[in-house]
Amino acid sequence: MSFSVAVAGASGYAGGELLRLLADHPRLEVQTLTAFQNAGERLRQVHPHLTSYADRTFVETTAERLAGHDVVFLALPHGKSGAITAELDDQTLVVDCGADHRLVDEAAWDAFYGGDFAGAWPYGLPELLHAEEGGTQRTRLSGVKRIAVPGCNVTAITLGLQPGIRAGVIEPEDIVAVLAVGPSGAGRSLRTNLLASEILGSASAYAVGGTHRHTPEIRQNLETAGGGHVSVSFTPVLVPMARGILATATARLAPGFSAHDVRAAWELAYADEPFVHLLPEGSFPNVSDVTGSNTALVGLAIDEAAGRVVTVTAIDNLVKGTAGAAIQSANIALGLPEAMGLPVNGVAP
């Protein structure tokens, strides 16, 4: 049995990555591709790399076009999902790759996004640890009909730090995260600061001083994992790589814990995870190791002089950071094998 799929916003980077991954999925069948300004164009004009869809045509993005499918993936700009979702049947599985339904706290939404608060949906990070109820988020995704996919930066920081927060081996205050990110995370719209002539040979910090929209979502996740208040200073740095995130995060080592205790916490958290892997001691990931894959690689060290734990996490922002997480979560919701249709191996060189 196959499930019929519509991808809204299929002309963008996230939408295109959804199509690339879904092309090899044995149970999810893409029937409808929608776009805004690209409606009416053939897919090969926008995504020439997606040969299997080359002669398909984008249709306009309306609730009417999306209705009647078993699964609808939304890869739309922030603020565009709520109105469309309200018109879809509540038995349709809707997976939103935008930010509209990620935050639980309405005040945080108002402070960082603004506009109408659409409410939180079940969160699409299966590996997210839960301090109070125990277990992981995957048990809370089974059978749901609405899923909010995490922000890509949020996923990288959460996967890097949550084992230590959950085990209490790192302090939840004074966490610092600096992320090297590629421009595809900002979407496909033309912006001067994302031009090759501006990016190549350079690097630039942005949203400095806790102003990035992913900040409250990072806190939300780490507080879910740890059960208490968390403070995080998060700074993204735009670097000249098309895709990928390398997240370097540090936190104070909690009193009374050793390097052995720290490593044991990460090993326990990720021992059975299909897509999150702790690297051997002394090894740290490269972004190129995970390109094109749904895998997250985590390196771990102790800075003895500073008394801090250091994690380095690499993900592909378009796969594990967006489209892969969407499909992984949809698999769980539909009762399919969690890893179905998702690549574990990266592409090299």
Curated annotation (Swiss-Prot):
SUPFAM superfamilies named among the record's database cross-references: Glyceraldehyde-3-phosphate dehydrogenase-like, C-terminal domain, NAD(P)-binding Rossmann-fold domains
Compartment list: Cytoplasm
One GO term of the biological process aspect: L-arginine biosynthetic process
SMART domains assigned: Semialdhyde_dh
Main subcellular location: cytoplasm
GO cellular component, one term: cytoplasm
E.C. no: 1.2.1.38
Keywords of this entry: Amino-acid biosynthesis, Arginine biosynthesis, Cytoplasm, NADP, Oxidoreductase
Catalyzed reactions per annotation: N-acetyl-L-glutamate 5-semialdehyde + phosphate + NADP(+) = N-acetyl-L-glutamyl 5-phosphate + NADPH + H(+)
Active site location: 152
A Gene Ontology molecular function term of the record: NADP+ binding
Pathway: Amino-acid biosynthesis; L-arginine biosynthesis; N(2)-acetyl-L-ornithine from L-glutamate: step 3/4
Recorded superkingdom: Bacteria
PANTHER family: N-ACETYL-GAMMA-GLUTAMYL-PHOSPHATE REDUCTASE, CHLOROPLASTIC-RELATED, N-ACETYL-GAMMA-GLUTAMYL-PHOSPHATE REDUCTASE, CHLOROPLASTIC-RELATED-RELATED
Stated family: Belongs to the NAGSA dehydrogenase family. Type 1 subfamily.
Free-text function comment from the UniProt entry: Catalyzes the NADPH-dependent reduction of N-acetyl-5-glutamyl phosphate to yield N-acetyl-L-glutamate 5-semialdehyde.
Protein's name according to its UniProt entry: N-acetyl-gamma-glutamyl-phosphate reductase
Origin species: Clavibacter michiganensis subsp. michiganensis (strain NCPPB 382)
